[in-house]
Amino acid sequence: MNLIEKGKTDFEFEDERGLICQISHGDIAQVNYVFSKKGAVRGKFHYHKRAKEQFYVISGKLKLEVFKGDTREEYVFTTGNVFLIPPLVRHNFIYLEDTLLVSTYDRCVETGENEKDIFND
């Protein structure tokens, strides 16, 4: 059973000028740019009740730990990888190198004043 979905970019175009990479299209409510230093840990096995997250690794390397119920999984992602974490899947990031990534959400995790779709219970 895979708790997450490994994805790919919608398209990539590269020529002598550089690269265009379409990470996602459609309904995106929130976009985050994240830089984490080697050895950093983020997430603390939080989860979202409603939001679905998609990540694109711009550069670097990270280990993703996920669990739901009795199922636990680990993945390593590097530059160019895309992955999606569905609602209710707990997740934690361990950065194996300095890493840049973009995360998109299908709905905002900040749902109102002092309200968030981020849980650690």
Predicted regions: what is each one?
Residues 25, 59, 98:
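ATP/adenylate-binding site constellation spanning eukaryotic-like Ser/Thr protein kinases
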Residues 50-63:
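Glycine- and acidic-residue-biased ligand/ion/polar-headgroup-sensing regions
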Residues 33-50:
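Conserved short histidine dyad/triad with adjacent acidic residue
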Residues 2-5, 10-15, 94-121:
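Double-stranded beta-helix
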Residues 1-30, 37:
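A short, N-terminal "cap"/entry segment at the start of jelly-roll beta-barrel domains
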Residues 69-87:
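Short acidic-glycine-tyrosine-enriched beta hairpin
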